[in-house]
Amino acid sequence: MPKSKVRKKNDFTITSVSRTPVKVKVGPSSVWFVTLFVGLMLIGLVWLMVFQLAALGTQAPTALHWMAQLGPWNYAIAFAFMITGLLLTMRWH
């Protein structure tokens, strides 16, 4: 019975691709980024306070008459500022 031939081995071996995630080291966030998200949250808070305390009611000052005309949209604007600031905190290092 004939013998089978021995095959040559390749000079290189194929390495399997690693599936483990590699954590990228990122430095701390810059000062302007922290200022931005804290500022956005404070703007939303101040917007809500001004609307509740000054622009609501029949005795609204003429400077805030435009805010009183927005009505319930003031809540959406204030919370949009605050939520945007909150979402930016997730990118903070």
From Swiss-Prot:
Disulfide bonds: none
Signal peptide: none
Record field: transmembrane: 31-51, 70-90
Keyword Nucleus appears in the UniProt entry: no
Subcellular location: Cell membrane
Pfam short name (any one): CrgA
Keywords, sorted A to Z: Cell cycle, Cell division, Cell membrane, Membrane, Transmembrane, Transmembrane helix
GO cellular component terms listed in the entry, alphabetical order: plasma membrane
Record's bilayer topology term: Multi-pass membrane protein
Superkingdom, natural source: Bacteria
InterPro entries: CrgA
Keyword NAD: no
UniProt-listed GO biological process terms: cell division
Annotated family: Belongs to the CrgA family.
Function noted in UniProt: Involved in cell division.
The protein's name: Cell division protein CrgA
Organism of provenance: Mycobacterium leprae (strain TN)
